[in-house]
Amino acid sequence: MARIAGINIPDQKHTVIALTAIFGIGKTRSQAICAAAGIAENVKISELSEEQIETLRDEVAKYTVEGDLRREVTLSIKRLMDIGCYRGLRHRRGLPVRGQRTKTNARTRKGPRKPIKK
């Protein structure tokens, strides 16, 4: 298994699909990385040479991925909560942030129903 950005990339998948195993790289970015590295998208990871894998590593290193990206997202949410803006309050209360209705629905974000005590 090839190791890129601290992640074991699946060998038996095509390059474009295999790169999406890295957090922060979707299909479009994966295609851009393959094009920049000069590697065909339909080649499997196991068929790549060590030099080609090294060029993939260099291309992936240009983006914010994995731990750095997770940390960045967490810190931006924490910043919203610290400044006390509306979005931060919604995060703090565990409610939908982007204006969805909460009278009905939003069960995933709110958790299981709490029965009304009489």
Curated annotation (Swiss-Prot):
The keyword tRNA-binding appears for this protein: yes
GO BP, sorted A to Z: translation
Keywords: Ribonucleoprotein, Ribosomal protein, RNA-binding, rRNA-binding, tRNA-binding
Span of the signal peptide: none
Single GO term (MF): tRNA binding
Coiled-coil ranges (or none): none
Protein name: Small ribosomal subunit protein uS13
Source organism (scientific name): Edwardsiella ictaluri (strain 93-146)
